A protein has these predicted regions:
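Post-DEXD/H (motif II) to motif III coupling segment of the RecA-like Helicase ATP-binding lobe
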Residues: 1-26
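Long, hydrophobic alpha-helical segments
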Residues: 201-253
Length: 476
């Protein structure tokens, strides 16, 4: 199954996969479209709607910043009662204690309102969905996570923003958002409320670049295709990458998460350096600040890392260097998190932005993209050093400790499964598993043990329960 609202795939895809494409237009619920007026006050119009409608409501916003702006506005213009639900209050206190008491995610929870976006820790995001499913949360503000793997729906869906990544919503995306309204066997009529006219219906066409490559197919994918799968129009482009002598083709293929053109640009820059300058890149395991700065500059300018770093709240190579250095110096995530939140607030950054900058950095850059780029740079630098007859470098140990955030290697995987580091620490200290255990051993131990005693209060106990269900435990 490809997904909803898809009407066509390329003929060549059907031919290569030897498949048939069937369209199914059956809808499990009816959806009614309602138009809201932006003027004179869009937020007041939304507040009036929330006063009037019954049932749970999802509100689509284009970004985490938009959710922050909207919840702040809503709580300013409406006196929303504090929730009486014990689990929500505990969740609000937990987020307040571990992040900041003015973080609007925590503030919203105190009023029985949920926020869900990609910067939230996985456990908190999973909690928001479960609390919404159980009816504890009546209003849930979402970003594109609404349509990217979040399996929930509501009687009412409000499209507050008609954009995604600063572009107008296309028909396919709008249809997916609309599809979150209503649920079979719960509410057969769904309501979708919009401030702007929906996008015009178009023929939703899904291409498959790995099977039907075109001009927009990334070079990193093209060089990994067999020769017969590369169309003649792209043959020259692919041949130029495969026949160049600057870097081994296997190196380009190995680092498929980075475009080969960027890898080659980095190599060209390094080759052009004088020996004295090139030798500055020869470091291993325990870098000083200038070592991190040197490699960060190259990642930012030549290796194409700037775009990914900006998505993780890094505004420059210098900022990226400073944050990596602070993390490396502290060697303690909770301490780093507290210090960086406080230091940003002292420079007049809002508590909301400060918290979410740190979350974005830890999840999107430090534990994911930075190790990927540093490992690629390690191979490029070593190749150039070898060409010049110089001693090699070894950035990989440093990349690994940053990726795991100075924690047992299993912690990052457990975090993605929905178990916060704070609870993993309790389990480790309680000898439920050992820091050197493989992930398989850890997961098996956690699946087959009764762990609720490690949770402080309802919230943590339910987080542990959600996590255990997610890894296949049978919870009575």
């Amino acid at each position: 199954m490809l997904g909803p609202s898809i009407k066509s795939i390329p003929a060549i895809v059907k031919e290569k996969l030897n498949c048939k494409f069937l369209i199914e237009d059956f809808q499990t619920v009816a959806v009614e479209l309602h138009f809201l007026k932006k003027k004179p006050n869009k937020d007041e119009a939304l507040a009036n709607l929330l006063d009037e409608i019954d049932g749970q409501t999802m509100i689509y916003c284009q970004s985490p910043a938009s959710t922050r702006k909207l919840i702040k506005s809503y709580l300013d213009i409406r006196e929303v009662e504090m929730t009486q639900d014990g689990e929500l209050l505990e969740a609000a206190k937990w987020t307040s204690d571990n992040y900041h008491d003015e973080w609007l995610v925590s503030v919203a929870l105190r009023h029985g309102i949920g926020i869900h976006h990609g910067r939230l820790p996985r456990a908190l995001g999973r909690f928001m969905i479960r609390a919404f499913e159980e009816g504890k949360i009546k209003i849930l503000l979402c970003t594109s996570t609404l349509i990217e793997g979040v399996n929930t729906s509501a009687k009412n869906v409000v499209v507050y923003d008609s954009k995604l990544n600063r572009r107008s919503l296309d028909f396919f995306t709008f249809s997916n958002i609309k599809g979150r309204s209503g649920r079979m066997f719960r509410h057969f009529m769904g309501n979708i409320f919009v401030f702007d006219a929906p996008p015009e219906e178009e023929l939703p066409f899904v291409d498959m670049p790995a099977i039907n490559p075109g001009e927009n197919t990334p070079s990193s994918l093209l060089i990994n295709l067999s020769e017969m799968d590369v169309p003649s129009t792209l043959r020259e482009k692919v041949d130029s990458l495969l026949r160049q002598k600057l870097l081994p083709v296997e190196l380009l293929k190995q680092h498929s998460g980075i475009e080969p053109e960027y890898l080659l640009d980095a190599a060209k820059t390094l080759i052009s350096l004088e020996v004295r300058e090139l030798e500055r890149y020869v470091w291993a395991s325990r870098p000083v600040y200038d070592d991190i700065k040197l490699t960060s500059d190259l990642i930012w300018t030549q290796l194409g890392g700037a775009a990914a770093a900006r998505q993780s709240s890094m505004r420059s190579a210098s900022m990226m260097t400073f944050w990596i250095w602070r993390l490396y110096s502290s060697r303690n995530v909770p301490q780093f998190r507290r210090e960086m939140i406080i230091s940003q607030i002292e420079r007049n950054t809002s508590p909301d932005e400060a918290v979410e900058n740190v979350l974005a950095f830890l999840r999107g850059w430090a534990s994911f993209n930075y190790p990927k780029y540093l490992a690629a740079l390690n191979d490029v630098v070593n190749h150039v050093l070898q060409l010049k007859g110089l001693s090699g470098c070894n950035y990989l140990p440093f990349a690994m400790i940053i990726e795991h955030l100075f924690q047992p290697s299993s912690f990052s995987a457990l975090e993605e499964y929905g178990l916060p580091t704070e609870i993993s620490e309790k389990l480790l200290n309680g000898r439920v598993f050992n820091k050197d255990d493989s992930l398989d051993v850890v997961v098996n131990n956690l699946r087959n043990r009764k762990l609720d005693r490690f949770g402080d209060g309802i919230f943590e106990k339910r987080v542990i329960e959600d996590f255990q269900r997610g890894i296949g435990a049978k919870i009575s």
